[in-house]
From Swiss-Prot:
InterPro entries, alphabetized: ChlB/BchB/BchZ, Nase/OxRdtase_comp1, Nase_comp1_CS, Nase_Mo-Fe_CF_bsu
Chain ranges passing through the membrane: none
Function: This molybdenum-iron protein is part of the nitrogenase complex that catalyzes the key enzymatic reactions in nitrogen fixation.
Name listed for the protein in its UniProt record: Nitrogenase molybdenum-iron protein beta chain
Subunit structure: Tetramer of two alpha and two beta chains. Forms complex with the iron protein (nitrogenase component 2).
Gene behind this protein: nifK2
NCBIfam families per UniProt: nifK
Sorted UniProt keywords: ATP-binding, Iron, Iron-sulfur, Metal-binding, Nitrogen fixation, Nucleotide-binding, Oxidoreductase
Protein source organism: Methanosarcina barkeri
Lineage of producing organism: Archaea, Methanobacteriati, Methanobacteriota, Stenosarchaea group, Methanomicrobia
Annotated Pfam families: Oxidored_nitro (PF00148)
Primary enzyme class: oxidoreductase
Amino acid sequence: MLDYTPCEEVTREAVTINPAKTCQPIGAVYAALGVHNCMPHSHGSQGCLSYLRMCLSRHYREAALATTSSFSEGTAVFGVSANLKEALVNLTTIYKPEVIAIHTTCVAETIGDDVGVILEDVEAEELIDPSIKICAASTPSYVGSHITGYDNMVKSFVTTFTKKSKPNGKLNIIPGFVEPGDIREIKRILSIMEISSIVFPDTTDVFGAPLTGEPGMYPKGGTPIGDIEDSANSVGTIALCRMAGGSAAKILEGRYKVPAKIGPTPIGIRNTDRFVMNAAKLANVAIPPELEDERGRLVDMMTDAHPHYHGKKVAIYGDPDILTGLTSLVMEMGMEPVVVLTGTKSSEFEKEVEGLIGPEHPEADVISGGDMFTLHQIIKRKPVDLLIGNTYGKFISRAEDVPLVRVGFPIMDRANLHYFPIMGYAGAARLVERIANTLLDRKDRDAPDWLLETIQ
């Protein structure tokens, strides 16, 4: 398995080997599906949309609803405004959405389609019901990643739909490209703190809705469009992820004077402390004892298990916002990051992670815009005890005989992980348990018969 991966790196400027990211439209579709009765529309070919839906469906084990402009060779050359107009008429007639969220693809961006102008024509020609709300985001696949696409779509929601009116006393939460289980955990924390909130996009009952047997075109979840409109009147905004949702928080602050706190992603003790304190300050509430108890239990867990993971070398890869949180957590656990790699290019990410690791580990590699081939090369030169990341690390895991803790997107070879949080004190506790017990499983596997103990 991967036997011919060389240890020494060769400079590569125009080729990626085994990407550590996916494309912008996937993030845009995921964000759009977090809005109630919203139909994501891919302004591209049927093949583009099939790929997006496949990636989301394989991770979440749920159907990902979306439509397409169905580009062909001819329309790609001569223009596709007629396709988009026909698609909007068809999807409003058949699917009857409240909101349509259009994102572009490589071909649409390459031929220079101006979606905004086409939508003006749709309005002027009265092709669809004017009560249906439409927004559009530019999401070319050859720039950025799924994180960029998510950020662009949420930014489009805010710039298109928000309306200033009277204060609502609520706190905005922009989750980022995170799992439904994480959003549900954040909402639970806010409920304990008795904070009224507007969470958008909210995928908790979209990818993770209960199976009731009741028919329906759209899942019951998602943020109502009225809540997004009302987000301009909130007491503050917390973007859990700097790169996925931070732009929308800045727009709300700049345009409507809604105070914004952007990051850090609440994974681990310190980052969750920051989130809880930011929420308490913006909403002007006290931190309840129940959360203090949760924090105390997490500290107790980490203390109990620390001999099993302290000093262990770890390689982490995935989305940048999740990686900053995971890096903070493993540093709190006393582990040693050898490499932290994301496929999304960002100098801010590199600076933040380097600041978390600090001078204690000057040999650590922090890479943005990297790929899985680079990750493997580094691990071959600097062996690790544990991998933390998505499904695509399993090949490196087998090749180097290193255990893998699956975290992030996509995870297509294990079931139900998206239901459980990694955020908050409860999420960190779950990660601590998984990391410690994965290392203990490896210790048992490698132990000779005379060292196989019932007590660790």
